[in-house]
Design a protein with these regions (language model features):
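Short, well-ordered alpha-helical segments
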Residues: 43, 48, 56-102
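Short, conserved loop-to-beta-strand elements that form functional interface hotspots
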Residues: 98-110, 133-135
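Positively charged, aromatic-enriched nucleic acid-contacting surfaces
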Residues: 112-114
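N-terminal presequence-like segments and the immediate start of the first folded domain
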Residues: 1-53, 116-136
């Protein structure tokens, strides 16, 4: 396959202008009151993060007293949100207005370095009742 036919997703970009709203992303494989009119394929958002030394020190101190380790919780939530936003951007770039079957996956690439992948199927949907309008 020539390099001209390969779609690339920019990962260092300014905030995207969405045509896929967060409300139009689901873990289900169908959307109530909508019909899928076109499947555009798999879309994904990948973020690779490492822990910083100061956060690791703070988390170590929190483990001594127990409870929720807020430093890691915040890092995990921020990373998942970023991967999700990149997935939505990718769906927008391929012309989708919804994503079905959304999932997350994580992989530890090396000590302290983790990849978070958000993925799903980009689709074009339309309301089942023609009088209703799609809201992005």
């Amino acid at each position: 396959m020539s390099s001209e036919n390969v779609q690339r997703v920019p990962y260092a970009v300014s905030p995207p202008r969405y045509s896929v709203s967060h409300q139009m992303v689901t873990t289900a494989f169908e959307m109530p009151n909508y019909r899928i009119v076109q499947n555009l394929g798999v879309v994904r958002g990948i973020v690779v993060r490492s822990r910083n030394v100061f956060a690791t020190l703070g988390a170590t101190l929190q483990t001594i007293v127990g409870g929720n380790i807020t430093v890691w919780t915040r890092l995990c939530e921020d990373t998942r949100r970023d991967a999700f936003d990149i997935m939505i951007q990718h769906a927008t770039e391929v012309g989708a207005n919804a994503v079905i079957g959304a999932r997350y996956d994580t992989t530890e690439l090396s000590a302290g370095v983790t990849e978070v992948l958000a993925y799903g199927t980009a689709v074009i949907v339309e309301p089942v009742n023609p009088g209703e309008s799609y809201r992005s």
